[in-house]
Amino acid sequence: PAMMERFSVQPNRAEKESEYISRNIESTRYAYGLTEDKVTYQENWGAKGATKEAVASDVATVSNIRLLDPEIISPTFTQLQQLKNFYGFPESLAMDRYNIDNELRDFVVAAREINPNSLRENQKNWINRHTVYTHGNGFVAARANQVDEVARDVGSARGGYPVFTVSDLQTTDENAKKLGIVVNEPRIYYGPLIASARDGKDYAVVGSETGNSVEYDTDSSTYTYEGKGGVDIGNVFNRAAFAARYQEMNLILSERVNSNSKILFERDPRQRVHKVAPWLSTDSTTYPAVIDGRIKWIVDGYTTL
């Protein structure tokens, strides 16, 4: 088989494997319900301009035309929804759809993550960075086809801003309730921005032995991680292993590390998928979604020939 593959198949792969590729494509179309009896294929369907009558009659499309571009709107999200210097949003945001009044509507969506690269000097010591500023806060969405008002004058700072729907620790706005995008657990411990630390040390040490919470939640409250993630570092052997990995003696010496402590690491959702399923080819971006009241990261993965 190896000789056949090397001297016959590889030099003529397109011809030799065309039959099997065709079967794969046919099976994929069948699995996704894209067979010819269900889908009509039209050549050059967009070559002719649409008439005014056709545009006027296509209410579903026109009413959902995007006014917000997820590739360029991130600075506006940051300016209006960052809240604290240590929170942030990715440079490029994502699109998602939610069922509003029995219709799927486009939203620009983002998770308000901890940004380790935005911490001030007094926030960068080991205790603050790895045991206090551990998680993000909330889900922010904006209808892609809406802005607050039209900017009527050139250079005007009024109008053209997103209409935000916010669910976070401080509030769940009425708009979120009406649209059904309500988050029951707004704390975010994993995400691409969280994992973007320039020194590669994106880990967080969580868990309390005394019941005293130390993780920053809001200006008036703290929190202790209650999730199932992370690795137990309550014993000296695990502490030593992670201390060696990150070249950090505080993991052994600090009183913040106790018998109930866990370490959260490898916090980029896409990289986590690569670790457990290296045979998958993943999309270059991940995006957050509200599912059953929780913020979850969607990673699109594909098997390839």
Label every model-predicted segment.
Residues 1-305:
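Soluble extracytoplasmic regions of secretory-pathway and membrane proteins
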